[in-house]
Amino acid sequence: MKLDVVTIFPEYLEPLRTALLGKAIDKGLISVDVHDLRRWTHDVHKSVDDAPYGGGPGMVMKPTVWGDALDAVCPDDALLVVPTPAGVPFTQATAQRWAAERHLVFACGRYEGIDQRVFDDAARRVRVEEVSIGDYVLIGGEAAVLVMVEAVVRLLPGVLGNQQSHEQDSFSDGLLEGPSYTRPVSWRGLEVPPILLSGDHAKVAAWRREQSLARTRERRPDLLPPESSSD
């Protein structure tokens, strides 16, 4: 998978080259290129923003700069991803769908966002998805890109040591993942649930399912189908 990120703060994306993501790069499973948007500016000050039409606070990122940048780094077969609090929710299902893509391009906005015409123009030749990682506002799109890339890349074959690691994740079956335990059996007066020590795989699986349902019912009842939410 090829990943391109366009931003005015390339250093913000350095975590993409660390830990498991860095190992995925070393293995050739992904390639990551981070591009400084200011390369495509047209003035000596390398300005990327201007005052909004219609008035209002803040600044809007220029279409002239972004248009040239996307022309250069976003080919017709790529998926262009725009992190924005005004986007559709990014979910595990989104991550799974994107994991099948060959090329993702992320456009990191700042200030009051990017001129809408940038995406309207891009949509003439590429698929564009405006996506939100939550109902809150960040300073820019870079942190959201780190979240989304990690969620997607960990699903690629060979990135995680154990394929079941993501197959049993929260949201993989529509539920939150239940509690996890490791050694020692007893710690500060708290015990590992005996069922996990039984060696009975069927009973362990049933217990984990029950815990997953209980946690989802308590913390995210909106994820449950109507017939399960009141069980």
UniProtKB/Swiss-Prot annotation:
Keywords: Cytoplasm, Methyltransferase, S-adenosyl-L-methionine, Transferase, tRNA processing. S-adenosyl-L-methionine binds at G109, I133, G134, D135, Y136, V137, L138. GO terms for biological process: tRNA N1-guanine methylation. It catalyses: guanosine(37) in tRNA + S-adenosyl-L-methionine = N(1)-methylguanosine(37) in tRNA + S-adenosyl-L-homocysteine + H(+). Its EC number is 2.1.1.228. The keyword Plastid does not apply. GO terms for cellular component: cytosol. Disulfide bonds: none annotated. The keyword Transmembrane does not apply. It is found in: Cytoplasm. One of its GO terms (molecular function) is tRNA (guanine(37)-N1)-methyltransferase activity. It comes from the Bacteria. It is an enzyme of class 2 (transferase). Specifically methylates guanosine-37 in various tRNAs. Homodimer. HAMAP family: TrmD. NCBIfam families: PRK00026.1, trmD. Belongs to the RNA methyltransferase TrmD family. This is tRNA (guanine-N(1)-)-methyltransferase. It comes from Nocardia farcinica (strain IFM 10152). The gene is trmD.
